Amino acid sequence: MTDPKTKSIYTVNKDGSTVTYTSAKNVKGTSLTIPSQIKLNGVTYKVTSIASNACKNKKNLKTVTISRNVTRIGSKAFYGCKKLTRVTLGKNVTSIGNSAFENCTSLKKVTIPSKVSKIGNRAFYNCSRLTSVTIQTKKLTSKKVGSKAFTRAGKQNYKKLVIKVPKGKRSAYRTLLKKKGVSSKASIK
């Protein structure tokens, strides 16, 4: 289904009351907001996920805001959005798919919300200008963070990469993040 206002495409999920943001084919602007709900054909749906490849290689996209109802970001959802500098993840996101933000080479700052329990392989791979990562979740383990999730993140200047983690998780997350590709030169606080 296509939203007539934004031209964004949504797919109704099996439950019939929620939708997945499927495509930004007609989005030409620099800013994108994934809404918490949309009204299509007179029916209001909650937007609960972003499909794989939904915004892949959108060359002009600079900022993305993901609403509170979204729980899942699909694989390669924002892959290769090279001008993307800022992403605001909704507080209810639980899963960030494989390569979701891979090669977003202008991304500078990201906050991983407290409900995230899974970060896929290469999720932030080659986000080379990343300087600030705030991890609010206490749920991450080696099995729930994919291979190379943070490899080459902040590679422009590893010494400027600051990763803030929850109190009581500094030691465990330092070990975990280094196994998943964070440079030993990055600061984990």
Predicted regions and their residues:
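Structural signature of tandem-repeat unit edges
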Residues: 9-16, 27-49, 59-72, 82-95, ...
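N-terminal low-complexity, Pro/Thr/Ser-rich intrinsically disordered segments
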Residues: 1-10
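Conserved functional micro-motifs across diverse proteins
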Residues: 20-22
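Consensus positions within tandem repeat domains that build extended binding/scaffold surfaces
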Residues: 51-53, 74-79, 97-102, 120-125, ...
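A structural signal for leucine-rich repeat
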Residues: 125, 146-154, 175-180
